[in-house]
């Protein structure tokens, strides 16, 4: 068939012999890519009389949307909460390394820090597209400092803050600016938190409840005010109680505004959350589960003492502790590891495990029209996996950026 490239002269790549994750199912279907986007082959055939310039044989493997990690504190010796002399270089190193774990986009996460750290680091962590140099940056996740002292976890207590008014003045005094910020985790029981949630939501920033002593009614009020996420469900919050289920109760609450989905992060590293708790959460609210790594500086490093934010942490096996304690301090898990563990622990389908690391975080951030999906017109950020869910190849904008 002769080619009519009236629409674009850009080369077309056709991925064949693959099962692609689409419409919540793995389907035997080819994937077509041009100019960094997923292409509709019917339009190509009938409107352009076009054909593929390149064919890639996937050898019966799975193609899924690239993973999105909305809670990543650092890794490979880099701590995003440290105001180093080369902040951008550190982010670039982590962005490059996580390609091998299938992550094509992420939110660099800053833990509770003093204002001068935020003022220096936030302007340096700019939103940017991914590519051969590394995964894309979707925006910063600010985890703290407006959190509960009782549920601070590994966050240093001396830098915790409360809201004076909850307005923009509080936020600017602490953070310096909100450009490039995608998400803020706060404790909704703090006085004036409602005003802060309104302010952040009105700016298009995702508000998450976490590191909190909130009861269910306080959590529901936060959602009614605009919060849409729960930071690492079960961790650093009141445990589930049958008379007041606390933040966990949001998974089955009947007071969620119509049309709104509450999403929740889960650290499926086999340490932070018992497999039974994973199963309970997933079966209660499968559409809201978002896998996160909450990975810290020591991801990819040997055991020993490392830095996280303003604190020292000890790595012992697969555990990361606040130095000298048994308090967990993030994880050293990678996203592909979390996907495999979640699949095994929950007994969910392959499709559900993959979507928890791709579609759901994209929906949470309001970008599922272009990320976390293989629908026509979406960004061609995807991964090739074998049946064991081991990542074999990673693509960003249709370009191979990593291969095993």
Swiss-Prot record:
Paste the cofactor note: Binds 1 divalent metal cation per subunit.
A GO MF annotation of the entry reads: metal ion binding
* Sites where the protein binds substrate: 154-155, 235-236, 243, 269-272, 328-330
Q: What keywords does the record list, in alphabetical order? A: Carbohydrate metabolism, Hydrolase, Metal-binding
The metabolic or biological pathway listed in the UniProt record of this protein is: Amino-sugar metabolism; N-acetylneuraminate degradation
- Which residues are named in the active-site annotation? 294 (proton donor/acceptor)
Which Pfam families does the protein's record reference? Amidohydro_1 (PF01979)
Which family is this protein grouped under? Belongs to the metallo-dependent hydrolases superfamily. NagA family.
What is the recorded name of this protein? N-acetylglucosamine-6-phosphate deacetylase
- The gene for this chain is amdhd2
């Amino acid at each position: 068939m002769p080619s009519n490239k009236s629409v674009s002269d850009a080369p077309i790549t056709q991925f064949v012999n693959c099962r692609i994750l689409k419409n919540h199912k793995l389907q035997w279907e080819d994937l077509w890519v041009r100019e960094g986007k997923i292409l509709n082959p019917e339009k190509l055939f009938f409107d352009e009389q076009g054909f593929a310039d390149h064919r890639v044989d996937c050898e019966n493997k799975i193609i899924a949307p690239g993973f999105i990690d909305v809670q990543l504190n650092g890794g490979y010796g880099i701590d995003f909460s440290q105001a180093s002399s080369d902040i951008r270089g550190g982010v670039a190193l982590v962005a490059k390394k996580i390609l091998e774990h299938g992550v094509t986009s992420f939110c660099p996460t800053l833990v509770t820090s003093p204002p001068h750290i935020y003022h220096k680091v936030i302007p340096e962590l700019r939103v940017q597209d991914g590519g051969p140099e590394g995964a894309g940056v979707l925006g910063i996740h600010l985890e703290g400092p407006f959190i509960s002292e009782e549920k601070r976890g590994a966050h240093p207590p001396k830098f915790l803050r409360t809201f004076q008014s909850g307005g923009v003045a509080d936020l600017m005094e602490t953070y310096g600016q909100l450009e490039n910020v995608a998400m803020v985790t706060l404790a909704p029981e703090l006085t004036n938190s409602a005003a802060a949630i309104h302010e952040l939501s009105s700016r298009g920033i995702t508000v998450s409840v976490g590191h909190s002593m909130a009861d269910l009614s306080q959590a529901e009020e936060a959602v009614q005010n605009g919060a849409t996420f729960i930071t690492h469900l079960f961790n650093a919050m009141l445990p589930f109680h049958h008379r007041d289920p606390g933040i966990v109760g949001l998974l089955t609450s009947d007071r969620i505004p119509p049309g709104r989905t509450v999403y929740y992060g889960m650290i499926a590293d086999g340490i932070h959350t018992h497999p039974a708790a994973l199963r309970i959460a997933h079966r209660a609210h499968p559409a809201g589960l978002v896998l996160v790594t909450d990975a810290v500086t020591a991801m990819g490093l040997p055991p020993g003492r490392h830095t996280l934010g303003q604190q020292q942490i000890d790595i012992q096996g697969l555990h990361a502790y606040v130095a000298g304690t048994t308090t967990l301090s993030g994880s050293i898990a990678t996203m592909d590891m979390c996907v495999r563990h979640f699949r095994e622990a929950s007994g969910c389908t392959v499709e559900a495990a993959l979507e928890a690391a791709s579609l759901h975080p994209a929906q949470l951030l309001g970008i599922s029209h272009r990320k976390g999906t293989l629908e026509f017109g979406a960004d061609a950020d995807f991964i090739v996996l074998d049946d064991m869910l081991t990542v074999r190849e990673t693509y960003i904008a249709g370009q191979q950026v990593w291969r095993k």
